[in-house]
Amino acid sequence: MDKSLFEQARPILEQIQDNGFEAYYVGGSVRDYVMGRNIHDIDITTSATPDEIESIFSHTIPVGKEHGTINVVFNDENYEVTTFRAEEDYVDHRRPSGVTFVRDLYEDLQRRDFTMNAIAMDTAYKLYDYFDGQQDINNRIIRTVGIAEERFQEDALRMIRCLRFQSQLSFDIATETFEAMRIQMADIKFLSIERIVIELTKLMRGINVEKSFNHLKSLKAFNYMPYFEHLDMNQINVTEAIDLELLIAIVSVKFDINYSLKPLKLSNRQVKDINQYIQIMNALPSIITKEQLKMFVYDYDTHLIKNVMVAADVLKANDIQGHEPLIVNLQTIDETLHRLPMHNRKDMMVNGGVLMAHLNAKSGPWLKDVLRQIEIAIVTGKVSNEETEILKWVDNHVKI
């Protein structure tokens, strides 16, 4: 089992210990280590206060000092070091009203969300598991630390995280944990949509997404999320992992809607991808010739095209017509892309200025139309991408 990331962080823990404080690895990295999975981010918990951590290390960043977290920069890597803490009453089902620093590891671990995430480990790889997290991992069970209702009242996002972990790890959810989610799911309406979107993005890429997505529906989670709250999500089926952006596009096509995406507070890139996914799904069924395929591959991001094609079963499960496999398949997409004479309008050997000078015409709506006609002619092989040939083609085929 690869311990290299733990070993890279070991000097940080040892330096904290050399100064008279406790320090442990904690959270997802320990969970994944116990499961035999690849380790990613290393989180460290300690009895030292943020001020004490800053005094121990020469290069620190106070990213969340008021909450007990200091970034320690070591060998050009950032490590989150968080003081043992007990959280006070939560407000709005999403954040504690205050944080109290403590010196006891048990007190710190008991505030965490799930037993599998509440295991600490020292530099000798000894585990500190006060809540039977290893047993739950071995039994493939997601269970809250302590009383489920209390954990979800503290932070309603934990319910969505629970389903995300189920999707990623293919674990079952403990009965009492699931029942608490059923009772308290409405509390997610107090959360920021940004936090929900982060969890949904990970959930949709999980190996067991079908089960978790069905739980989202049965628990009526979508009823309390902006954008989705106006839709009958029970009609949407997800049978395999897809991007969240593709899910939103499928919803738009399935219900033939054009709702604003602003309530989801997505990035410009995400909105652009969703709109392309919608256009791709609408265009796919009509592609029956090689010329149409060339323009399709030219007009759209081939990565997104392939995502839609790979998700053919999801489209079918939502009664969305897919592609004609003899014309459009992964091989023909790659071959067509490789053979395109150009890949965007910037590659074209004429521009608007050249056209206006050649035709002795002022700019106007005609220009955009003619440039598109030239694009199509070049991509479909009707004219070569050379200025003299293009202008000759314009003289013979274009009227303004």
UniProtKB/Swiss-Prot annotation:
Q: Which Gene3D superfamilies match?
A: 1.10.246.80, Beta Polymerase, domain 2 (3.30.460.10), cca-adding enzyme, domain 2 (1.10.3090.10)
Family annotation (InterPro entries)? Bact_CCA-adding_enz_type3_sf, CCA-adding_enz_C, CCA-adding_enz_firmicutes, NT_sf, PolA_pol_head_dom, PolyA_RNA-bd
Q: Which GO terms describe its biological process?
A: RNA repair; tRNA 3'-terminal CCA addition
Q: Supply the enzyme class, top level.
A: transferase
Tell me its cofactors: Mg(2+)
> In which residues is CTP bound?
28, 31, 112, 155, 158, 161, 164
The function of this protein is:
Catalyzes the addition and repair of the essential 3'-terminal CCA sequence in tRNAs without using a nucleic acid template. Adds these three nucleotides in the order of C, C, and A to the tRNA nucleotide-73, using CTP and ATP as substrates and producing inorganic pyrophosphate. tRNA 3'-terminal CCA addition is required both for tRNA processing and repair. Also involved in tRNA surveillance by mediating tandem CCA addition to generate a CCACCA at the 3' terminus of unstable tRNAs. While stable tRNAs receive only 3'-terminal CCA, unstable tRNAs are marked with CCACCA and rapidly degraded.
Q: What else is known?
A: A single active site specifically recognizes both ATP and CTP and is responsible for their addition.
Subunit structure comment from the entry: Homodimer.
What name appears for this protein in its UniProt entry?
CCA-adding enzyme
Question: Which organism's genome codes for this protein?
Answer: Staphylococcus aureus (strain Newman)
Q: Which gene encodes it?
A: cca
